Amino acid sequence: SASKHCRVILAGGTQMLAVLQLAKYIGYDAENSAIGCTSYIVDDSQAKFLETVEQIDNIAVLSCDPCLHNSQHFGLRSYADGFVKEGAGAGGAIIASLLKTENSIEKLFALFEQEYKRIST
């Protein structure tokens, strides 16, 4: 398991619950591991994400609010409104960026807005 050699962030929304269960089965280092996701996953009462993590193992859960509710774009606001579930590692990618760079949520949000505008026009 990679977690025995380096720090690992599992990123991909609720799908990572299955990965965590598999990691526990094959053996991993929980101290070197965390699940990274957006606040949309953690705050989703239907997903019961934190409760399920606790049932599987004692592992850190890192979450971030990408502030998409402030977006000028309906497509991005849909995430904050609960209409879209990412499941693509967005939260983990944001967390990794915050940990490894001098980015802030505000800087990243501005980049999200810029890129969304670029690809949608």
Model-derived segments and spans:
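Helical "lid/coupling" subdomains associated with nucleotide-phosphate turnover
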Residues: 1-121
